[in-house]
Amino acid sequence: MKKVYDVIVIGAGHAGIEAALAAARMGKSTLLTTLEKAGVALMPCNPAIGGTAKGHLVREVDALGGQMGLSADEALLQIKMLNRGKGPAVFSLRGQADKALYHDVMLRVLENQKNLDVLYDETTKILVKDGVAHGITTLENGEIEGRAVVIATGVYLNGRTIIGAETNSSGPVGFKNATHLTDNLLSLGIDIRRFKTGTPARIAKDSIDYDEMEVQEGESDIGTFSFMNDGNLYSQMPCWLTYTNEKTHEIIRKNIKRSPLYNGTIHGIGPRYCPSIEDKVMRFPDKTRHQIFVEPEGRDSDLMYIQGMSSSLPKDVQEEMYHSIKGLTHARFIRYAYAIEYDCINPLELSSSLQVKRIKGLYSAGQINGSSGYEEAAAQGLMAGINAALYVDEKPPFTLNRDEAYIGVLIDDLVTKGTNEPYRMMTARAEYRLRLRQDNADLRLTEKGFALGLATEERLKKMQERREEIERIVRLSETVKIKKENGGIFERYEGVQVEKTMPVKEALKHPGITFDVLKEVTNAFSEFSKSALFSAEVMIKYAGYLEKEDAAIRDARRLEEKILPEDIDYNALSGLRIEARQKLSKIRPATLGQASRISGVSPADITVLLIYLKTAK
C-alpha cells in the first residue's frame, strides 16, 4: 500500500472504532487495521453497555460526537437506571445489547464513513524515526505511512486463554491474537506489563429453568443512551436473577488447587472489581451466596451470559458448580468460562493527550492502557483519535479536566497515578460527581465537540434547545406558586405539614417533592420534556451543593493553571523528598494540579514547586 494516511488506528474494538471515526469525522484520511472482520466491535464479555459510572462515559462520548451511544441504542434488548436510591449524581443507565447486532451496526457505520479505510491485517511494527511515529508495518501489506498512529489493541497482544490446565495462544472467543507488536513496543523503550481478565460460561437458553429464578424486567420510560434519540425502548427482553449457594462454594473450595488463579498458571494481574467466582468465594468466606444474573446475548441468539460466574476452573468443575445453582441444574454448556492474559503498557508512559511521551505522534487507547471495560475503552479511543487528528494539523491537544467529565477523571487517573490492575471507572473516583451527572453530559460537552468538528450542527441545536427548555423551567419555578390549600402533598410525600403558599422552586427543596409529584397540584409544567424537567429539578434541589462544588473547582483550577516546564530538573530541587523527585521525574506532570495527585508527592513538595515557579519567573 503506497497511500500516506493522516491517522492509522491499530485495532477495531471499542477504543479503535471511536479513534478512527473521530479522526475521519475531523477530516483526516484514516486507516483502521484489525486482525479479522468478525472481531470488529466485538463484545467478548458481558452483553451490556453502561452501568455505574460507565453510563456516564457513554453519555459523554455521545455528547462529544462519538458513536457508542448511537450504536448501543440500535442494539438494545433492555435498559435500566441503576442507583435510583443513591441520588441523581450516581444515576447510571445500563443496557443489555444484542452482540451480533451491535457488531453489524458498527461495521455499517465504519463502511459508510467518509475518509476511512478498513484493512484486515496484523500490525507487527510501529515505524519511528528520530522519536516521531510515521506509520506501521503489517504482516501482509508491508509498510504503510501515516502521520499519526493510535494503538488500540485491547486484549490481543500475546493473548493467552486459560481453562484449568488448558492454555491456548489466542485472543478472546478463540480469535487470532497479535504476536509481533509487543517486541516492537519493548524495543521502543515502552514499559510493558501483563494483566488478566476473564469471562463466564455461555449456556444454551433452552437448558435453563427460568421458573426457578427471579425475573428482571427493564424500564420503558427512561429514554436511551444517545441525546440524539428522544424515544423510549418499549420492546424489551427480560433477564433473570439467581444465586450461588453453600454447595457451589464447597465445590469451588474442594477444587481450588486446580484453579489457574491459585496454582500459579496465571501470572497476569486481574481486575479487583470484577473478580472470578473462585476469587469471590475464597476472599469472602462469610458470604453464603453471590448474585448471578442470567442475560440474553441477542434476540436470535441461543446463548445466555451468566454474569457473576467468571472463572478459569477446569471444565468438569465448571459443570459441577453451575449445575449446583438454582435454575442452572440442567445447564448445557456452549462455551466454557475462561481467563485471558494479555500485554498492556504502563499508562504512566502517556501524557494527558494519550500520546506516548517518548514518541511524538504515537497515541494509545483502551485496554492496552491498563483499563477494563468497553466504555472506558471507547472514551479513551475518542480522545486519542481527536488528539491524533489535532496533532496532524499541528494544533494543541484537547484534554478534559476532572471537573469537566468522567473522561477527564479516567485519563487523569491513568496517566497520573498509573494502575497495577485493570482500571475500572467508578463514581467514587470523581470529586465533582454532582456536576458530572449523566443527564447533563450534553450541556457540558457538546459545544466542545462541535468546536472540534466532531459533533454535528444538528446535535448542537438539539442541545441548545434542551438547555433553553431547562432555563425556562427554572424561571417558571420562581413564579408558579403552590397554594396553601394544596399543602397536603407535603404531608403525603414527606409526612410534614406545610401551611403556606410557596414558589415551586422552594417546594422542590423538600426531598420528597418532585416535578412528578407537583403534577397533582399544577399543570404549569406539562409542556416540558421529562429529561429537561429532571435536569432542572436537580439544579434547583441541589443548588447549595452545586455552589460548594463550584467553589472547590475554582480552588483546584488555581493549581491546574500553574504550568510546570517540560525540562524541569526535579533532582536539582533540594527541598523535594527523594520519593517525590523520583515520581515527578518519571511522570513529568504538566501542571501543579497534576503533580498534587501523584501518589508519593506531599503538600510540602507542592509548596517547593510553587516557590520554584515563583523564583523561576
Language-model features: locations:
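Beta1/beta-strand and adjacent pyrophosphate-binding region of the FAD-binding site
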Residues: 2-15
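Conserved N-terminal/central alpha/beta ligand/cofactor-binding core
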Residues: 4, 21-125, 140, 152-172, ...
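Short hydrophobic core segments
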Residues: 10, 143-154
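Conserved beta-strand-loop-beta-strand element in the redox core of flavoprotein oxidoreductases
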Residues: 127-143
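A glycine-rich dinucleotide-binding beta-alpha-beta segment and adjacent secondary-structure elements
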Residues: 305-371, 399-412, 529-583, 588
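Internal hydrophobic alpha-helix adjacent to the cofactor/substrate pocket in enzyme cavities
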Residues: 377-398
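Extended, charge-enriched "interface" segments that sit outside catalytic cores
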Residues: 429, 446-605, 611-617
